[in-house]
Amino acid sequence: MDLIPNFAMETWVLVATSLVLLYIYGTHSHKLFKKLGIPGPTPLPFLGTILFYLRGLWNFDRECNEKYGEMWGLYEGQQPMLVIMDPDMIKTVLVKECYSVFTNQMPLGPMGFLKSALSFAEDEEWKRIRTLLSPAFTSVKFKEMVPIISQCGDMLVRSLRQEAENSKSINLKDFFGAYTMDVITGTLFGVNLDSLNNPQDPFLKNMKKLLKLDFLDPFLLLISLFPFLTPVFEALNIGLFPKDVTHFLKNSIERMKESRLKDKQKHRVDFFQQMIDSQNSKETKSHKALSDLELVAQSIIIIFAAYDTTSTTLPFIMYELATHPDVQQKLQEEIDAVLPNKAPVTYDALVQMEYLDMVVNETLRLFPVVSRVTRVCKKDIEINGVFIPKGLAVMVPIYALHHDPKYWTEPEKFCPERFSKKNKDSIDLYRYIPFGAGPRNCIGMRFALTNIKLAVIRALQNFSFKPCKETQIPLKLDNLPILQPEKPIVLKVHLRDGITSGP
């Protein structure tokens, strides 16, 4: 039996030509870095270097740093990406030329109305939205929100107390995830959710669906391999985020706005109210006000960004404190000194706690939740002798930067003293960037730090955390794009001196 089909010569020529053209398309952009003299891993047709991400972005970036130095080239499907770790180049990309030459990160794919969110808006649109949102992220506004966050901290203490009294080991993500969700709904929408005790709440269920975006989803990989399909999916109203979820949240947020416009007597300090107020603020004289759809987009992206940062960082902090009891004790002593007799947390108290700041900074160095920050070049430029053509993505590998042994002594060691007043000045500003850097850094940085610190204070005022048999030591990281432990962080929670205070 003949295994090779008996096609006419013309058919074979057509098949061969099609395969050659397909190969050319799948590799046409993969010669750029060789042409520029920039090293990097060998890309595969169509896939580029994306399969290496299965090892974990954080791990792959560190391996590349060890092999290629402070600069290398990658290919996300067809998209070339220059990776830089030199502090001067990072400063130029993120600060000096952040407006004139570079714009926001590449869109992930078909975003629908979410493309107007601050994280994805470009150039003048980004400036307009950032200007309108900035007043909501000032120290004055955070002071007003501390009582809301404190209420969430009280609910966290109540939940942890039940586990401590029953001598149970706890999955920290369950408790700090619930705390984070309560903070988001409380500070964003003024809604008291108590998510740990109300898991079936429709608003909560839809927010959790929103947060399940899988960066290795086949649909997302398809967009990476064939970026020209993005406009097609946009036209078909197919997006990255589940349509039923965005539709539910959009309708819910619109109803909230209508309700608030009718009830003008109540004074509210949450982010949503401040975005509504911005639609009629003085800033709108020089900047077009947020549309209702843009207001919804900002609300959804705040949910998305705030949840991962806080709910992931808090378990990492508690793990390090549990495995470094001397650090935990020293931090508890500082908390007790600034807030004696388990006094309520204030914004001024947060600012005073130097050792708490050191612990949080060191944890974010070891475990930056977002392991990369990306910009896109708008025009040809040469930086430090390196030619960067228009359209090229430029990426800073934050995890690799924070773990580079050339700049950090024993980079895998948890050492809060790195960030003491004595040592902090010696740290290069562009070697430690857990929230990015420059004008386009994370607008919610101080908000996230406030949430994290308040939770740590309330927890350590009342409890001590210790490893148990389920605790993975040493901690291993998963291969997900957003930094996560391989296994849930499980610890034993103990009442301090057998007593607790609070609600």
UniProtKB/Swiss-Prot annotation:
Membrane topology: Peripheral membrane protein
Coiled-coil parts of chain: none
Catalytic activity: an organic molecule + reduced [NADPH--hemoprotein reductase] + O2 = an alcohol + oxidized [NADPH--hemoprotein reductase] + H2O + H(+)
Note: Chimeric transcripts, characterized by CYP3A43 exon 1 joined at canonical splice sites to distinct sets of CYP3A4 or CYP3A5 exons, have been detected. All are possibly produced by trans-splicing. CYP3A43-CYP3A4 chimeric transcripts exist in 3 different combinations: CYP3A43 exon 1 joined in frame to CYP3A4 exons 2-13, CYP3A43 exon 1 joined in frame to CYP3A4 exons 4-13 and CYP3A43 exon 1 joined in frame to CYP3A4 exon 7-13.
Keywords assigned by UniProt, alphabetized: Endoplasmic reticulum, Heme, Iron, Membrane, Metal-binding, Microsome, Monooxygenase, Oxidoreductase
Signals that turn on the gene: By rifampicin.
Entries under InterPro entries matching the protein: Cyt_P450, Cyt_P450_CS, Cyt_P450_E_CYP3A, Cyt_P450_E_grp-II, Cyt_P450_sf, Cytochrome_P450_3A
Named cofactor requirement(s): heme
Organism: Homo sapiens
Source organism, top-level taxon: Eukaryota
Entry-linked Pfam families: p450
Entry binding sites for heme: 442
GO cellular component, one term: endoplasmic reticulum membrane
Known role: Exhibits low testosterone 6-beta-hydroxylase activity.
Tissue-by-tissue expression: Highest expression level in prostate. Also expressed in liver, kidney, pancreas, fetal liver and fetal skeletal muscle.
EC number: 1.14.14.1
Family recorded in the similarity comment: Belongs to the cytochrome P450 family.
PANTHER family according to UniProt: CYTOCHROME P450 3A43, CYTOCHROME P450 FAMILY 3
Protein name (database record): Cytochrome P450 3A43
